Amino acid sequence: MKKHKGLKTIGKILAVILVFLLVINIIPPKKNVENNPFLVAKGELPMIAAHRGGGDNNPENTMLAFREAVNTIGVDIIESDLYLTKDGYLVYNHDSYIDETCNVNGDISLEEVEALCEIKENRHYIKDMTLAELEKYNFGYYFEDENGARIYKDVTDLEGTGLQIATVDKLFEEFYESNPDLLFIVEIKNSGELGYEACRILYETLNRYPEYKDQIVIGTFHDEIEEELKANYADLMRGAPTGTAAKFVITQFLGVNIFDNSDFACLQIPTSYDLGIEVYLDKETIIKRAHRRNIAVQYWTINDADGMRELIELGCDCIMTDNPELLKSVLEEYK
């Protein structure tokens, strides 16, 4: 008899839990943002984001790459990282130092540069250089075409060819009139005081190009910069930092998304995380639950055609890639 009562009790508890989960998944969750330009309509193909401007196709983070990505390939989004120079300019570069993307060390091989940079004191950090100093160097110096040829190594007209380091201001100015619908994903890489200053300068720059203010999403891996953006630049859209993204994904897997109180606009994630075991994030459920809250789901960094097809068929909003030419050709298969 006691055994039957125990089973009934367990059954009631499970029923309550089931009803609870059902109810909280029926209740419409609050929208993180009302108008999100990074969302695609149901049934539409994902946007193309040129990661670092499309570093497989052209020298990464240069105006040459950005122009080719927008004007020739027709990407929807430019994605890159931002660093602050010594004299207060925001420039695009993946690393905090420039050695591996330009000829700051003279005519030596990339292998020699990498060996040199193993010692941090040998590196040329952006924060220690002025814009004028940075603009002297060829940021296409080590780029190789599909045949392995360094086709920009001997270019002398760096400004004319777009091989100088690129500033945020120059990029916005380039496309503001011709491409008013262009979208931007940026990551502020500086931390602490430099990161705060980077936020301020980016905001001031956006005030000079107001139409782009609603077309940019900003990310950071630094908690203090995330708090700065939330506190002082709340009108700008933010991407989910790692911890927030993890919390969101976990609540979606558990079906308790109503308890997630985050306010980011874009969920930027890889297709999987290695946490001792491989956790796969290329799931339709994640995308659907994000869409219920007006969150765009953007996957990085996808450079193979099969991976692109998988995400297209899942219904994601954006694929970030080093090879936007390839992604464009894959998307043509679905038209």
Spans of model-derived segments:
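Phosphate-group recognition and catalysis centered on beta-loop-alpha active-site segments
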Residues: 2-335
